[in-house]
Amino acid sequence: MGWYSKGFEEAEVQAAATQGNWTKEFFLKSGEEAQGVRILDDDSFNIRAHFVKGKGWFTCIQGIGDENCPLCEEANTPKSPIGRAQNQFVFNVFDPREYTDRKGETHKDQVKIWRVGITLLRVLNKKRNKYGPYPTWVMEISKMGSGQSTAWNIEVEKATKKFTLPEGEELYDLEEALAPKTRAELIAVLNNTPITASNDNDDDDEEEADIDWKKG
């Protein structure tokens, strides 16, 4: 992996690696809570993914084809900005919270992607056995701690009426939004990633980053 590339074909690869549809990510910081959250899918969409410092989440390609995943290779180097691959179970969710972005613009009532680990998925599935399909829930979610010490509290109520998304909001096509890039595209991503982070946090269950977007 070098720090530059040459030629038109490599330029196209690099451009493809830095383009794509931005997707909004649902997350809570320790001590935060969210009310009125709704899971919009019947089941989780299951992947493995790496977090790249400053870039967001990228689906791991190890074992998908004949090529090795460059993110897996880089994640094993000291002080890498690439996190090791994590099991992720992904949902479309409705987040009614209001927030102000870095540009000073206010947003609320948005569809976002929620990535959960297996521990939280088991909690959700247990509640599904009790309350029925996910889309019929209205949730209050709170979180304490981070990494392996994360504790979630999820209260579920059954919805009393059919839910309709606000105008302009729609579900993400998760197969499209989470589709893996090619090895060449991932290498192009790495070529533009500063080595400023550590991969010491190996938690593949509840690790989250304070970032509200992801580039697939």
Description of each model-found segment:
Residues 63-65, 139, 165:
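Glycine-rich loops and low-complexity Gly/Arg-rich segments
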Residues 91-93, 139-141, 154:
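Hydrophobic beta-strand residues in large extracellular and virion-surface proteins
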Residues 116, 144-172:
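OB-fold/S1-family single-stranded nucleic acid-binding modules
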Residues 134-148:
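Flexible glycine-rich surface loops and low-complexity tracts that mediate binding to linear polymers
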